[in-house]
Each structure stands twice: as C-alpha cells, then as structure tokens.
C-alpha cells in the first residue's frame, strides 16, 4: 500500500524542498499542511500538480493552534510519516512577537502531537528543533553535540527548547514514534532575505545592478555559524524516518 506523509509548513523553504525531494524520490501520497493565510511563493512550481485531479500532492488548510482543523487534517491524511517543520523561525522576530512564537512553536507542537495521540494514529514523527537551543556555547565545549546543555539566547530558542521537551514527553509518556533533530542553519534556494547570508547576497546583486550604493549592511560578523544546505538537510530528514528510524533519539 502506498505510504502517506504529512508535511507541516510545506509552504516554507524547508518544507517546499522536502516536498520536491519526496515527489522525485518516492511514490508516496503527500499532504502539505498550511495556514489559510500562508504565502505560496515557495510552492508556486508545485501548484499545477496540486490542482490536478487525483494528485499525489494535496494541500490541507489548518492551524497548529486550531484543534478542529488539525484533527480534520489528520483524519484526511492518515499519515505513516509526519514531518513537523512549521514554525516561526526568525529569532529577531521572536523578541518582538514572543507570544506568537511560543504559541506556534511550543504550543503548536504540543497540539499536533496530542491530536495524533487522540486519534490513536501511529506515524513516525520528525520534530524539527534547532541548534539555537544551545545558544551561547563556550569555546571549550566545541564542537556542539547532543549532550550539550540548553542555553537559549532568544524567545525563539526558548520555544524550541519547549519543542524538544514536548517531543520527548510524548515519546516517553505515550510511546509515540517521535524523532527530534537540532539542525543548524538551513541555507540555499528560497531562503528569506531577512536572514544574514541571503541579505548579503541580495545586497550584492542590487549593488551589481547599480540599484543601491556599494555598501553592505551587516550585523555581528564575529559570531561563528554552522550552515547546512537545505537540500542536504531534507535528504537527512528523509533518511531519518525511512532508514531504521529510532524513536526517542
């Protein structure tokens, strides 16, 4: 029987690349969870497929903070796999919108996993946390690994610590098949220009087109960052749930 997968946050950079990967690599029925107000520019290239009759890619409109819509989406999709990628993912925004960041990232993750539990579904669930949970790391503690302590430095990072703990709770308390990742910064095509490397690239392109003065606005260039190409990241996420998955890891 054909496998079914639900991708939350399919209209985001990572979700759209994961959809691309699964369309090419599998014969699965793919369901993408998106909000009614979600911009679709990252998935414009997929809309023709979505609109086809009996398409293997379907969008389900729901909100992580609306139980009835989550329940309906899960009842329709009956997923074998869930990739939970939906999040408010910009740390700077989280300082200005802490409540909505917590509601989406922390409470939203709880709502999704609890809805799965209430329906007694048994999918493998990838909960996408973030390396931001480690925050400021001392030089002597490098390189970072899974045993590093939480040291969040933003409301976003705090929300992802909550996401981590929610995933662990549902695994330990109810035996749900949850796997958690703390990937470092994703970069690549479709990366928003509010993020550093995309902002630099955009400014350079505008300078070369003589549309702005030859001056690049930057932030703190002394911080050390680890980047992962989004196409490598979604390959890792695919393998996480399909190649000897180990819930609780």
Residue ranges and their predicted role:
Residues 137-143, 165-241:
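NAD(P)-dependent short-chain dehydrogenase/reductase
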Residues 1-186:
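N-terminal Rossmann-like NAD(P)+-binding domain of SDR-like oxidoreductases, especially those catalyzing
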């Amino acid at each position: 029987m054909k496998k079914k997968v639900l991708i939350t946050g399919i209209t985001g950079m990572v979700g759209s690349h994961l959809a691309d990967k699964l369309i090419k690599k599998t014969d699965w029925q793919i369901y993408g969870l998106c909000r009614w107000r979600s911009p679709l520019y990252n998935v414009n290239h997929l809309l023709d497929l979505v609109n086809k009759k009996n398409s293997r890619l379907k969008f389900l409109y729901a909100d992580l903070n609306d139980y009835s819509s989550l329940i309906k989406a899960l009842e329709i999709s009956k997923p074998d796999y869930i990739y939970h990628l939906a999040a408010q993912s910009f740390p700077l925004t989280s300082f200005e919108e802490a409540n909505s960041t917590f509601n989406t990232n922390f409470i939203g993750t709880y709502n999704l996993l609890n809805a799965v539990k209430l329906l007694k579904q048994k999918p493998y669930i990838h909960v996408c946390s973030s390396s931001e949970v480690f925050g400021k790391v001392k030089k002597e503690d490098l390189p970072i690994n899974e045993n590093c302590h939480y040291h969040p430095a933003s409301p976003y990072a705090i929300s992802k610590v909550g996401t981590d703990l929610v995933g662990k709770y549902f695994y330990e308390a109810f035996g749900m098949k949850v796997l958690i990742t703390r990937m470092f910064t994703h970069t690549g095509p479709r990366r928003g220009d509010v993020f550093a490397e995309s902002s630099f690239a955009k400014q350079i392109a505008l300078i070369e087109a003589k549309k702005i003065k030859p001056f690049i606005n930057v932030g703190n260039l002394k911080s050390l960052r680890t980047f992962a190409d989004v196409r490598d990241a979604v390959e890792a996420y695919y393998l996480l749930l399909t190649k000897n998955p180990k819930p609780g890891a």
